[in-house]
Amino acid sequence: LKGYFEIALRDGIKPVKEHLKSNYFGSSFTNDQIKDALKNHDMLDKAQYVDDIDDEVGELLATSDMVVARFSGRLEWGPRALGNRSILANPSDPRIVRKINNAIKMRDFWMPFGPSILSTRIDDYLVDPINSPYMMLAFDTTEKRDDITAALHPYDFTSRPQTVTPEYNSGYEKVLNSFESKTGIGGVLNTSFNIHGYPIVWDPERALDTLNNSSLDALAIGNYLVRK
């Protein structure tokens, strides 16, 4: 920042301070690149091309107990998975925590997951809510907490949510809207797409390796849906 200010002053430019609008700064991959990775893993025959993949993911989460990984767009930069390299599940059933831990995370049972919540629904679930797009703030929860119980701290029912807006991530918001339209629940459980002890996946090869080496039910990767 000091360098920026010095150069701006040197060149007669007024320094500008802007709020961070997004942290999806990582790599993205085309459907053709994803198709090549599916071929390399001999998985193309298991993959279904879905035009409206985000609506399909929301429906899967709403109508089954499936744990679904989502690989879409540019990789998140920072310590949290924010929908583009995420593992998603229905947050209303606390039994899903054990399933996720057994399937991929292998974490201690008491370690909490977090929810992604539509910004239009934060008043329903959070006490004194404000938008928190980076999953960095903690909140007490309201009486409607049972909707998202699997994505809360099991001791005090606090939440460290990601709030989702169409401006921030329109595709991920569509997943949540699809899920909400079928369940009435305004959020999903969201945890990072990786096996415990490994970094978050960043490319199609790592995504498919993780699918094959875990008990995930499905992977939405680009416009392809791969089911176990």
Predicted features and spans:
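Flexible beta->alpha loop and helix N-cap segments adjacent to enzyme active/binding sites
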Residues: 1-228
